[in-house]
Amino acid sequence: MLVYQDLLTGDELLSDSYPYKEIENGMLWEVEGKWVVKGAVDVNIGANPSAEGGEDEGVDDTAVKVVDIVDVFRLQEQPPFDKKQFLGFVKKYIKLLTPKLEAEKQEHFKKNIEGATKYLLGKLKDLQFFVGESMHDDGSLVFAYYKDGAADPTFLYFSFALKEIKC
């Protein structure tokens, strides 16, 4: 199994269990998330409940709907960015990430980051923002949005910010 960590923070953000599609010249990975129900375990042990006992005081089995990727990788939602905040983040992010990339990747990154930024700016009002579990200020952002008519969110990752780790 492959796990993808944030190159800057080491937070696990994705795994190969979630197929991705490269977009924007390979700068972004698009990954489909799914709403899943967590909890509400129904245990049937075949016993007859007592008619006189009333309600059982068993465990709290409240079902909760979560997005699989957010839950599995413990992503933390952040407040939305306006255009100025987003561009400020991208500028700082480029400065932090570029020195961590190999020379050939640096060239591709510098050449194509503007296109990826414009793509994200076009969706800015529809995006949800997430960071890794550590909630580090300098970490990569993970973006989520809903495609037209979709019930499940689509996630966007900066591909160059991910470090592949074999588990």
UniProtKB/Swiss-Prot annotation:
The keyword Cytoplasm applies. Keywords: Calcium, Cytoplasm. Disulfide bonds: none annotated. One of its GO terms (molecular function) is calcium ion binding. Induction: Induced in root tips during the externally-induced root cap cell differentiation. It is found in: Cytoplasm. Belongs to the TCTP family. This is Translationally-controlled tumor protein homolog. The lineage of its organism: Eukaryota, Viridiplantae, Streptophyta, Embryophyta, Tracheophyta. The gene is TCTP.
